[in-house]
Amino acid sequence: MGVSVKPAARRNARQFALQAIYSWQLSKENVADIEEQFLTAEKYDEEEHHANEPKLQTPETDVAYFRDLFSGVALNHMKLDGKMRPYLSRPLQDLDQMELALLRMSIYEMMNRDDVPYKVVINEAIELAKVFAAEDSHKFVNGVLDKAAPTLRKK
C-alpha cells in the first residue's frame, strides 16, 4: 500500500488546481509557468487573505495531486470537453470559465484517478463550486457530473 494522504491535503490540492486551471484558461500562459507561479509565488497578501488559508508548498497540500490535476487538464482539455459535452444543457462556449475549469478538473479526476471514489469527486466539485463559482453553479456542476459518472466510471 502507498502512503496515506489526508483528505484535507487533497482538498487543498483541488482548490489550487482549480485556480491554476482557471488562470490558464483565461491567460493561455504556458502550463509550466503557471505551475511555477503557484509553487513559488507568495499568492497571499496578508491584507486580502486569511492567515489560515492553505499554502501550496506545505504538508497541508498534496502537491503531486495538484500537479496531476493541473497538467492533466491542460494537456487533455479537448478530450475532457468531448466527454462532458453530451451532459451539458448549454453549449460549451456558454459555460462560465469557473464552471468549465471545475468540470474539466472533475471529469479528469473521474477518468484518471480510480483511487478516488466518484462520489468524492462530485462532492468536492460541489463544495468548490459553492466557494468559487456563481450562486447556483453547484447545482449545474452536480447535475453534469452525476450524469457523466456512470460512463466515466464503469463499475
From Swiss-Prot:
InterPro entries for this protein: NusB-like_sf (IPR035926), NusB_fam (IPR011605), NusB_RsmB_TIM44 (IPR006027)
Q: Does the keyword Lipid biosynthesis apply?
A: no
Annotated GO molecular function terms are: RNA binding
**One cellular component GO annotation, for this chain's record?**
cytosol
Report the sequence similarity comment from the record: Belongs to the NusB family.
By its UniProt entry, which SUPFAM superfamilies does this protein fall under? NusB-like (SSF48013)
From what superkingdom does this record's organism come? Bacteria
- Membrane-spanning residues: none
Q: What is the lineage of its organism?
A: Bacteria, Pseudomonadati, Pseudomonadota, Gammaproteobacteria, Vibrionales
Annotated protein name in UniProt: Transcription antitermination protein NusB
Question: What keywords is this UniProt entry annotated with?
Answer: RNA-binding, Transcription, Transcription antitermination, Transcription regulation
Biological process (GO) annotations held by this record are: DNA-templated transcription termination; transcription antitermination
Is-annotated flag, keyword Transit peptide?
no
The role this protein plays is: Involved in transcription antitermination. Required for transcription of ribosomal RNA (rRNA) genes. Binds specifically to the boxA antiterminator sequence of the ribosomal RNA (rrn) operons.
